[in-house]
Amino acid sequence: MEENEQNNREVEPQQESGEESNRGILHQAPPGNHQPHHRITNFFIDNILRPEFGRRKEGISHQDELYTERDTGALSGAESGHHRVNVPEGAGGSSKVITVTGEKKSDLAMEETLKSRGLNGDHSLSSDSDSSQTSSKATQQPMLWPAWVYCTRYSDRPSSGPRSRKPKKKSVSKEDKRPRTAFTADQLQRLKAEFQTNRYLTEQRRQSLAQELSLNESQIKIWFQNKRAKIKKATGNKNSLALHLMAQGLYNHSTTSKDGKSDSE
């Protein structure tokens, strides 16, 4: 009787320890459809500046993305006293958990990871081939500008791409001033006679003179203006403001015309 009681007592703690281990296994092994997956992304400057940044790679399965997580989990478990390895049994997505203790835990972890990779070898080969095809397509396509080129703060039109400096147009040189008209003696004599008659020309009179002297109306108009200005300077008539300034010594401009100027000027 005493031996049976001792055996029952030994069995009970074993059952309790087994239940605790089963609870731990169930806690760490949720269903395959609800396994949380962490996506690893590299936010380095070199990757951000590339044109293909942000595009989703084709041909990479979900299991390939979890390789790194399984490897890191195996290494961290090898350092601890108890190690649990998730091993996919088949295509259904179910997995079994193996607890390993002792010196052989690192070897078993490596073997299980190699087996799991062996099961998915076809997927890795297909992903490698797809990546090579995408790289060859990228080389065939023309060079794409990175995204930061279209987001510069100095661009007035961000969607138009990088700015190209336009060559400056050569400034059109101004035409030289019209040379002075060299009037003939007959033309000057006729203009002087008309000026003595009347210093200001009407439109009809200017048109008739232009036809008679074979000149432009503007040439006749300019000659009359210059003639009036010369006479005004020669007479020396000054307005009241000029006289007031001269009394204060502030107005000393010469108003007499120089001798020797021809009427053609």
From Swiss-Prot:
Compositionally biased residues, Basic and acidic residues: 1-12, 102-115
UniProt keyword Transferase present: no
Main subcellular location: nucleus
Top-level taxon in the UniProt lineage: Eukaryota
Record localization: Nucleus
A cellular component term, taken from the record's GO annotations: nucleus
Region (Disordered): 1-38, 75-140, 156-181
A biological process from GO: neuron differentiation
DNA-binding region as annotated in the record: 176-235
The keyword Transferase belongs to this UniProt entry's keyword annotation: no
SMART domains, per the entry: HOX
Entry keywords, A to Z: Developmental protein, DNA-binding, Homeobox, Nucleus
Cysteine disulfide partners in this protein: none
One function term, GO molecular function aspect: RNA polymerase II cis-regulatory region sequence-specific DNA binding
Compositional bias annotation for Low complexity: 122-136
Similarity annotation: Belongs to the engrailed homeobox family.
Protein name: Homeobox protein engrailed-2-A
Species the sequence originates in: Xenopus laevis (African clawed frog)
